[in-house]
């Protein structure tokens, strides 16, 4: 599958204090078109914002399509590709029988992923990748636009 046939999505989360004021950002690219999404929450964590970025980006797509979603979050990457199937089998419990943190968002992400054909890709953050840098700027905008 070529990039021209896929929607390419870059996502990022930001948090000022952890927990604290947080934001999420997503850059969606398709056939030369771009769409920017961002938002924020007054009391959240970086991991929740990373998850929100992916959820909101996938939810913004009105119909099922092939996607390459690029994140700099090892938490999101490992969660969706390694941990989630076992959490579901165990009734949203970890291997140590503890409740999964952020289960509400993992469940929402799982629902969105089921609508599409998603290829996940991890990229190291803050290394100059243009899409990742834009997603980071959008996440910080989400924090900046929160009411004081």
UniProtKB/Swiss-Prot annotation:
Superkingdom per UniProt: Bacteria
EC id: 3.1.26.4
Gene Ontology terms, MF aspect: magnesium ion binding; nucleic acid binding; RNA-DNA hybrid ribonuclease activity
Key words of the record: Cytoplasm, Endonuclease, Hydrolase, Magnesium, Metal-binding, Nuclease
Residues that, per the record, bind Mg(2+) 2: 12, 136
A cellular component term, taken from the record's GO annotations: cytoplasm
Compartment(s) where it occurs, according to its Swiss-Prot or TrEMBL record: Cytoplasm
Cofactor (UniProt): Mg(2+)
Disordered: region residues: 125-148
Signal peptide: none
Recorded catalytic activity of this chain's protein: Endonucleolytic cleavage to 5'-phosphomonoester
Keyword Transit peptide belongs to the record: no
Record-listed Mg(2+) 1 binding positions: 12, 50, 72
Keyword Membrane: no
GO BP, one annotated term: DNA replication, removal of RNA primer
SUPFAM superfamilies hit by this protein: Ribonuclease H-like (SSF53098)
Domain RNase H type-1: 3-144
Cofactor: binding details: Binds 1 Mg(2+) ion per subunit. May bind a second metal ion at a regulatory site, or after substrate binding.
Subunit structure: Monomer.
Family per record: Belongs to the RNase H family.
Biological role: Endonuclease that specifically degrades the RNA of RNA-DNA hybrids.
Protein name: Ribonuclease HI
Source organism of the structure: Pseudomonas aeruginosa (strain ATCC 15692 / DSM 22644 / CIP 104116 / JCM 14847 / LMG 12228 / 1C / PRS 101 / PAO1)
Recorded name of the encoding gene: rnhA
């Amino acid at each position: 599958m070529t990039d021209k046939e896929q929607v390419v999505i870059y996502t990022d989360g930001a948090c000022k204090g952890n927990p604290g004021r947080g934001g999420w950002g997503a850059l969606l690219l398709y056939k030369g078109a771009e769409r920017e999404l961002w938002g924020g929450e007054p009391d959240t964590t970086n991991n929740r914002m990373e998850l929100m970025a992916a959820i909101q980006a996938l939810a913004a797509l009105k119909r099922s399509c092939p996607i390459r979603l690029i994140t700099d979050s090892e938490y999101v990457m490992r969660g969706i590709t390694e941990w989630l199937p076992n959490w579901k089998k165990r009734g949203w419990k970890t291997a140590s029988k503890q409740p999964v943190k952020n289960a509400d968002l993992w469940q929402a992400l799982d629902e969105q992923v089921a609508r599409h054909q998603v290829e996940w890709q991890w990229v190291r953050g803050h290394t100059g990748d243009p899409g990742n840098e834009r997603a980071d700027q959008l996440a910080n905008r989400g924090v900046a636009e929160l009411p004081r």
